[in-house]
Amino acid sequence: RQIMIRSFWPLLIPFSVVLIGSWRLSTESTIPTGGPQQVISRREKQRFPDYTFPPSGNLATCQQDPSLDDALLREGSRLGVRVIAGQPELAKKDATYRAEHGRLGTITLKQRSMSPAVRCMLISHEFIHVLQHLHGDLKGVDSLGWQTTPEGVQRFGSIQEAEAYRYQNRAGYVIHLLRQTPVSQ
């Protein structure tokens, strides 16, 4: 019996560290990430807007006001979304949003010539993915439940992309939801 205890003794300390660490993580409501953007607790979630309510069409669009791209970028900055110039991760794309588990991610914008309205829609599209990420409690990029078509889902490969493409011109509504979103502490 003593031989068995001695043979397992070196494993006791690492096992206890894992056990205590697992217990601490299970009792905390958020995962520490070192920044202001953390997994959203249930209490915080109650302060967030209802992201599932679809755009009504009453607010400005990128076609009507292409300068909305600047307001999108300001709101993203306020919330902690990084926006960088560079090569998007997906081939043949002008922009991508890289969601990070537990915190808001990074939008990468390809630097190329485009009309102001197209740039606005491109940025709005990526911020719809940010809204999907917020709706997924920063754990996943979940569908908002906004109306899409089966053809759109098939064409763009996912319901999330179909939502983003269908509503990317509705920058005023995207800004409205971002402004209602509190900065996570």
Regions found by a protein language model. Give the residues of each.
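Hydrophobic membrane-insertion alpha-helices, especially the h-region
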Residues: F8-S22
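Post-HEXXH active-site segment of zinc metalloproteases
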Residues: A117, M121, H133-E163
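Long, well-structured alpha-helical subdomains associated
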Residues: G157, E161, R166-Q185
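Surface-exposed patches in mature extracellular/periplasmic domains of secreted proteins
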Residues: I84-Q87, K139-S143, H176-V183
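Short active-site segment of divalent metal-dependent hydrolases/proteases
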Residues: S124-Q132
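Positively charged n-region of N-terminal signal peptides that target proteins for export
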Residues: R1-F8
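Auxiliary, metal-adjacent structural segments of Zn-dependent hydrolase domains
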Residues: E44-T106, R112-P116
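Membrane-interface motif at the C-terminal end of an N-terminal transmembrane signal
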Residues: V18-G34
